[in-house]
Design a protein with these regions (language model features):
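Glycine/small-residue-rich loop that forms an oxyanion/phosphate-binding "nest" at active or ligand-binding sites
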Residues: 65-90
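Active-site regions of enzymes building and remodeling cell-envelope glycoconjugates
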Residues: 59-69, 104, 175-176, 190-196, ...
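Active-site/ligand-binding-proximal alpha/beta "capping" segment
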Residues: 178-226
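Boundary-proximal intrinsically disordered activation/regulatory segments immediately upstream
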Residues: 1-53, 139-140
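RNA substrate-binding interface of SAM-dependent RNA methyltransferases
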Residues: 38, 93-182
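Amphipathic alpha-helical repeat scaffolds
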Residues: 29, 113-120, 229-232
Length: 248
């Protein structure tokens, strides 16, 4: 049975502070929830319609399942159109070491504010096989319901961590490619298989204090009249250039 207290708790998890205090976050949608058993995420409770429960009776055998009506699901959902099931999950422990980054290509996000952009970038990283995204502590929270939904499940396969970029970059030994307005032409730049791609804030770009760590400032050459590209599109274009150069 869905109690008022539980419904209130779920709705409170739209705020980062409440997620951190409770240690819980929300995952919605049949597709993403179906991927959870194979992930590192620990599910506390499931709230689902009878149709979903009947079709997935073998999933989550050790998890508390609460049957809800479509109307009840609508009351607790963060989606305009709820998708049969909502999972209440425990926030995972952050796992991060600068040494891990030294053997691969990773993305670094400086003060990225928009949840949609973060979700898109996580999905892009997953598409190109990039395993790590390192975010400044003031970037959008990956466990925001909007971010989770925008990733379409990719947050389960990409390790997203929050740390001091100044400290991390000071320890890093790889080349750092920073997306800036007046850098080297992306298509004339050699991007090795191992390195860091830094994407800055949507409005102000990479923080001036971090630019000293950017060994290779790069720019996507403009052909038309658009003023700029959003962070997600810029990340996709640069990741594609990296993938093409390092295709086996």
């Amino acid at each position: 049975m869905l109690t008022k207290a539980t419904a209130k708790l779920i709705q409170s998890l739209k705020d980062k502070r409440n997620r951190q205090e409770s240690g819980l976050f929300v995952i919605e949608g049949a597709k993403i929830v179906a991927e959870l058993p194979a992930s590192k995420i620990t599910v506390k409770s499931l709230f689902a319609t009878r149709n979903w429960l009947d079709a997935n009776e073998k999933l989550f055998s050790d998890v508390d399942k609460v049957e809800v009506t479509e109307q009840q699901l609508k009351q607790i959902s963060f989606l305009q159109t709820p998708q049969q099931v909502l999972a209440l999950a425990h926030l995972p422990q952050q796992e991060f070491s600068v040494n891990e980054l030294q053997s691969q290509f990773s993305i670094v996000l400086d003060t990225l504010q928009d949840p949609g952009n973060l979700g898109t970038i996580i999905r892009i990283a997953d598409w190109y096989g990039i395993k790590h995204i390192v975010c400044s502590t003031d970037s959008a929270d990956v466990f925001n319901p909007k971010v989770i939904q925008a990733t379409m499940g990719s947050f389960l396969r990409v390790n997203i961590v929050y740390t001091s970029l100044e400290t991390m970059l000071a320890e890093n030994k790889l080349p750092v490619f920073g997306a800036v307005m007046n850098g080297e032409n992306l298509y004339r730049t050699t991007i090795p298989s191992k390195g860091l791609l830094m994407i800055g804030n949507e409005g102000s770009g990479i923080d001036q204090g971090l630019l000293k760590y950017v060994s290779n400032p790069i720019t996507i050459p403009r052909q038309g009249g658009a003023e700029s590209l959003n962070a997600g599109i810029a990340t996709a274009v640069i990741c594609d250039a990296w993938a093409r150069q390092n295709a086996s």
